[in-house]
């Protein structure tokens, strides 16, 4: 008989799961931001177009077109910044609501994790108590058995003495 630990299989832990798995991933976030502010990528595209045009005109040696493309780059970057500021002002309330929602979700997750942790501790405590009780019963049973054997030896010895003395 083995008197090992209470149970060899570990209990499921509340720390095993990965909560980040269910949250928004990077690609979803990019697409959401693209839907929220569709003019920002347009401004970035215009900026890239102007830089590519300026590079080509510089290679050709056309200074007039190079300056024109650099001005267009400045206008495109100004447009991008203006769109960012306008979009930020427009979506500010939505972002505040989203932060509140995320805070509530985080609080709920924290409380769920705490409750799972407490349940896990209670289960482990109950298992430990049951194991200690089984070990105490086995120890009492062994002690009772030892007392019973000693008593039987005494009785048998007395019986044998009586038989030998009686003869």
UniProtKB/Swiss-Prot annotation:
Transmembrane parts of this sequence: 39-55, 74-91
Top-level division of the source organism's lineage: Eukaryota
A family per Pfam: HIG_1_N
Subcellular location: Mitochondrion membrane
Main location: mitochondrion
Membrane topology of this protein: Multi-pass membrane protein
Keyword Transmembrane: yes
Domain HIG1, first and last residues per copy: 11-102
Keywords: Membrane, Mitochondrion, Transmembrane, Transmembrane helix
Gene Ontology, cellular component aspect: mitochondrial membrane
GO BP, sorted A to Z: mitochondrial respirasome assembly
Quaternary structure (record): Associates with the respiratory chain complex III/complex IV supercomplex.
Similarity comment text for this entry: Belongs to the RCF1 family.
Function summary: Cytochrome c oxidase subunit which plays a role in assembly of respiratory supercomplexes.
Protein name as annotated: Respiratory supercomplex factor 1, mitochondrial
Organism: Pyrenophora tritici-repentis (strain Pt-1C-BFP)
Lineage: Eukaryota, Fungi, Dikarya, Ascomycota, Pezizomycotina
Gene name of this polypeptide: rcf1
